[in-house]
From Swiss-Prot:
Active-site residues (renumbered): S129, K167
Annotated site (Cleavage): A93, G94
UniProt xrefs under CDD domains: HTH_ARSR (cd00090), S24_LexA-like (cd06529)
Reactions the enzyme catalyzes: Hydrolysis of Ala-|-Gly bond in repressor LexA
Keyword DNA repair carried by entry: yes
Family of the protein in this entry: Belongs to the peptidase S24 family.
Lineage: Bacteria, Bacillati, Bacillota, Bacilli, Lactobacillales
GO molecular function: DNA binding; serine-type endopeptidase activity
Keyword Transcription regulation annotated: yes
Key words of the record: Autocatalytic cleavage, DNA damage, DNA repair, DNA replication, DNA-binding, Hydrolase, Repressor, SOS response, Transcription, Transcription regulation
Name listed for the protein in its UniProt record: LexA repressor
Length: 208
């Protein structure tokens, strides 16, 4: 196979992997790739996958049978723009502040969260009330939109004064407790609370 044909076949494989993950949420097997791109030998497919990995277009996990992840470079090669999630302002992790719903910018979506892309947003933390949970002042949290939570989960919640805060959630006998992860701070006790979402990720890099 000529280099041009080999490169074309590798892009065909890359496209098939992307489409399969996008459609069903997990990568194809090597035999599925064989059938899709009309190659009879699994060893030939393994060779193409190895070359895609060397080019930085694909990441393979040798400990798992079908753990294939297309890199941002790989998506660029396919002409696919990385998915992004909205950054919708600032939320307090100390004293609650008014929630900001305006979209300030967008942040590249981590590959492991792509299946939830439409349900995610990012907020910047101000304050130190969650430091014992490893959430520091200036961190960026990724939040999955949902209106329920289990006890002990870290949520973004609206208080009865229409303010947003990041705290650990507890539903108790006759009230809700929004518990800070800082031994010097008291919990917020509320008769009612509205949950905006659950914290599912954390980024410490500056996104500005």
């Amino acid at each position: 196979m000529s280099k041009k044909n080999s490169d074309t076949k590798q892009l065909e494989i890359l496209r098939y992997i992307y489409d399969t993950v996008d459609h069903r949420g997990f990568p194809p097997t090597v035999r599925e790739i064989c059938a899709a791109v009309k190659l009879s030998s699994t060893s030939t497919v393994h060779g193409h996958l190895a070359r895609l990995e060397r080019k930085g277009l694909l990441i393979k996990d040798a400990t798992k049978p079908r753990a294939l992840e297309i890199t941002d470079e790989g998506k660029k090669e396919l002409g696919i723009k990385p998915k992004r999630i909205p950054v919708i302002g600032v939320v307090a992790a100390g004293h609650p502040i008014l929630a900001v719903q305006d979209i300030d910018e967008y942040f590249p979506l981590p590959p492991d969260l792509e299946n939830d892309a439409g349900e995610l947003f990012m907020l910047k933390i101000h304050g130190e009330s969650m430091i014992n949970a490893g959430i520091l002042n200036g961190d960026n949290v990724i939040v999955k939109k949902q209106n329920t939570a289990n006890n002990g989960e870290i949520v973004v919640a609206m208080t009865d004064e229409n303010e947003a805060t990041v705290k650990r959630f507890y539903k108790e006998k006759d009230h809700y407790r929004l518990q800070p992860e800082n031994d010097t701070m008291a919990p917020i006790i509320l008769p009612e609370v509205t949950i905006l979402g659950k914290v599912v990720g954390l980024y410490r890099n500056n996104i500005d």
